[in-house]
Amino acid sequence: MKTQDDKKLDNPVWFSLSETHQNFGVDYGSVKFYYPDYCPFGGFEKGDAIAKSIDEYSKMVDNFFIVGEKPELSNLLKLNKELVCLQMIVYDAIDIPTKDKIVKLTDQHIDALYELVNLVQPGYFKRKTALLGNYYGIFKNDVLVAVTGERMQMNDFVEVSAVVTHPNHTGKGYAKQLVVHTVNEIFK
C-alpha cells in the first residue's frame, strides 16, 4: 500500500488529528493535541501562536510530548527530555504464522491493558488510549502478558503501538506474533 502521502508521517499527530482522529483532540489552529485522557501527544504546522497554544495545553496535563519537529517554547515550560524515535512502514500484509492464541481486547480488558503497558512504558498510554483503535493480547494462565494495538490513525496510515511484553515473559516471540497479527488486521 505505498502512497504519495508518506510525508504525512513527518507529522503523524497533526495528520491523525486532522483526519481519522479529529474527534479525539484539541485544535488550537496551528497546534493540535490529543485530549489528555487519550494520549499526551501533540503536533504542529508552521503558523502563529504555537508557543501560546502549547502553553494552553500544558495547563491540562502534568507532561506531554510534541511529535515531529521541535517547536519554539515559551519560558513557562521546561524541556525534560528529547527522544529520537525510528518510524518503520509496512506496505503489505506479513506472511508469518502465529502459534499463540491472540485475543482482541475489549472493555473488560482495559485495566489489565493499562497496567501492563504502564509497567513497561510508563506515561505514554492512558486509560482511554485503547479507544483510538483495536488492541490485541496474549494471555497465559488468564493473565495478560503481551499486547499491541493501533494508536494514531490517519487516512492512509495506522500506528502499531504499545508493543509490550511483561518482563517475566520476554523472549518467547509474543511481540513478533502480535505485530504480525495487528499489521494483518489493519490490511484487512
List where the protein language model places each region.
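Acyl-donor-binding surface of acyltransferase catalytic domains
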Residues: K2-P97
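Short amphipathic alpha-helix that is part of the acyltransferase structural core
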Residues: K2-K7, Y91-G123
